[in-house]
A protein has these predicted regions:
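FAD/FMN-dependent oxidoreductases across multiple families
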Residues: 222-302, 306-307, 317-318
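N-terminal Rossmann-fold NAD(P) dinucleotide-binding loop
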Residues: 17-18
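C-terminal helical "tail/cap" subdomain of flavin- and related membrane-associated enzymes
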Residues: 303-402
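A short alpha-helix-loop-beta-strand transition element characteristic
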Residues: 41, 57-72, 165-170, 313-315
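A conserved beta-strand/loop capping segment in the N-terminal third of enzymes
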Residues: 51-104
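Predominantly flavin-linked oxidoreductase catalytic cores and closely associated redox partners
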Residues: 13, 106-242, 278
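Beta1/beta-strand and adjacent pyrophosphate-binding region of the FAD-binding site
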Residues: 2-14
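Glycine-rich FAD pyrophosphate-binding loop
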Residues: 22-44
């Protein structure tokens, strides 16, 4: 039964909101999850990738469509690099609806309450808590909580309402789901080229009986074209049209990718998590794993603050400090991405691929490559691969200072 007063109200019942609610209820706190859509896991707005560490936390292996252990990467001119070890899982391609439902169900089984077709209308922080009005199927009702948490995505209502700033980067992604793509089981495909993914890459991810094909970039690199337009350029290009000629579209998705943590994810009695905080990885756009990591890092001090109803400035500062490593690592990952990809011309990318294709470099990638943490591999290549040393000065400041 839905109550009027909770310890925590979480706006957004996606995987990060569900995970947060689960962990808080496990600690004995009362939690209300609020989801604006009539069902969990819809609409679907990402590539459906869950990294191993995130999957280990949930154990939702029955939601897996394909285990990804390797990749085929292509330079703008078509140089192919094949990486991966079938014995090492790099990431999981999942059914996001089932995965999201599984995470939210964990929170419900642990004692959280859930409101569907509901959204916040207004909220006000007081000395003792947060007063919030929710629109529940068209009816406005009042609630109170000690803390309000936003896990409500790139355009977070919580973040905007409390003027918590904007993520450093807001990229745009577009994806279609198709049948008929001649992929290789267990390997995803990555395509680089300014014509169809300026500064970034396009992908083809095996997902059970279908393949998810998409691209992403920064708005200022797209000019007057959309990611959808540029994806068609890839699929119809003389170089790659044979790869896509038998594809039949069965679904499409478009959405923002916020990457660059906001200055203070916690203010007063309000906190934002995951995409709402700008936590997507600058190298892949993935956000679930980093959102889970944020929750785990903040959890002990978060539970203490909520339990004691202590949200003094020093407590809030301590909460923000718990995730400072996430910010530094995100900045370093972005610096490496810029050096090796975003700031490179097609000609420079072809040169980089000619180095990456060397057997000793592929061995290094297979040894140190980590979809969660590209920093060790990037640092090792800058240090040990002679052809990459000229890039080191470009990345030095960001890599050192984060």
């Amino acid at each position: 039964m839905i109550r009027d007063i909770y310890d925590v109200i979480v706006i957004g019942a996606g995987p990060v909101g569900g995970y947060l609610a689960w962990k808080l209820t496990e600690k004995g706190l009362s939690v209300l999850l609020v989801e604006e859509h009539p069902e969990i896991g819809r609409p679907f707005q990402c590539a459906g990738m869950v990294n191993p560490s995130a999957m280990d936390r949930i154990g939702a292996y029955d939601t897996v469509l394909t285990r990804i252990w390797g990749a085929r990467m292509y330079s703008p001119s078509g140089t192919e690099i094949v990486i991966g070890d079938p014995n090492t899982t790099r990431t999981w391609s999942v059914c996001r609806k089932l995965f999201d439902e599984r995470v939210v169900q964990l929170s419900l089984d642990s004692g959280a309450d859930l409101l569907l077709s509901s959204k916040p209308v207004s909220a006000n922080v007081t000395k003792s808590g947060v007063e919030i009005s929710l629109d529940i199927n068209g009816e406005i009702k009042q609630f109170q909580c000690r803390m309000l948490c936003g896990a409500d995505g790139a355009h977070s209502w919580v973040r905007r309402t409390f003027k918590m700033g904007r993520p450093k980067e807001l990229l745009i992604g577009f994806q279609i789901e198709v049948t008929g793509y001649p992929g290789e089981e267990g390997r995803l495909d990555l395509f680089t080229g300014d014509e169809f993914a300026p500064g970034f890459f396009a992908w083809a991810i095996p997902s059970g009986n279908t393949t998810r094909i998409g691209n992403w970039s920064l708005p200022n690199k797209l000019g007057e074209e959309s990611c959808e337009d540029l994806l068609q350029v890839l699929m119809k290009s003389s170089q790659w049209k044979g790869r896509f000629s038998n594809c039949k579209e069965v679904g499409r998705y478009c959405g923002p990718v916020p990457s660059g943590m906001i200055h203070k994810p916690v203010i007063d009695r309000v906190a934002v998590f995951g995409d709402a905080a700008g936590l997507c990885k600058p190298t892949t756009g993935g956000g679930i794993g980093k959102g889970f990591e944020q929750v785990d890092l903040m959890l002990p001090k978060l539970v203490e603050a909520i339990s004691t109803n202590d949200f003094t400035p020093s407590t809030v500062k301590n909460l923000n400090d718990t995730i400072s490593t996430l910010r530094r690592n995100q900045n370093k990952s972005r610096a490496l991405r810029n050096v090796f990809l975003t700031e490179s011309t097609d000609e420079e990318l072809d040169e980089l691929f000619s180095v990456w294709s060397q057997p000793e470099v592929i061995d290094l990638i297979n040894q140190l490559g980590d979809i969660d943490n590209p920093i060790p591999l990037g640092m090792k290549m800058l240090k040990d691969v002679p052809e990459f040393r000229r890039l080191a000065s470009k990345a030095a400041a960001a890599l050192i200072w984060g």
